[in-house]
Curated annotation (Swiss-Prot):
It comes from Serratia marcescens. This is one of the proteins that bind and probably mediate the attachment of the 5S RNA into the large ribosomal subunit, where it forms part of the central protuberance. In the 70S ribosome it contacts protein S13 of the 30S subunit (bridge B1b), connecting the 2 subunits; this bridge is implicated in subunit movement. Contacts the P site tRNA; the 5S rRNA and some of its associated proteins might help stabilize positioning of ribosome-bound tRNAs. Keywords: Ribonucleoprotein, Ribosomal protein, RNA-binding, rRNA-binding, tRNA-binding. The lineage of its organism: Bacteria, Pseudomonadati, Pseudomonadota, Gammaproteobacteria, Enterobacterales. Part of the 50S ribosomal subunit; part of the 5S rRNA/L5/L18/L25 subcomplex. Contacts the 5S rRNA and the P site tRNA. Forms a bridge to the 30S subunit in the 70S ribosome. SUPFAM superfamilies: RL5-like (SSF55282). Belongs to the universal ribosomal protein uL5 family. GO terms for cellular component: ribonucleoprotein complex; ribosome. This is Large ribosomal subunit protein uL5. One of its GO terms (molecular function) is tRNA binding. InterPro entries: Ribosomal_uL5_dom_sf.
């Protein structure tokens, strides 16, 4: 999960700031929660 957070912080935030002309990092939407669901039963 740390890899995803680092990627978002380092790459995605920069792209969003340039795409939407944000003046501050605090204006960029942040990821609050990621939920994964995987079924392992027989289909």
């Amino acid at each position: 999960m740390a890899k995803l957070h680092d990627y978002y912080k380092d790459e995605v935030v920069k792209q969003l700031m340039s795409q939407f002309d944000y003046n501050s990092v605090m204006q960029v939407p942040r990821v609050e929660k990621i939920t994964l669901n995987m079924g392992v039963g027989e289909a």
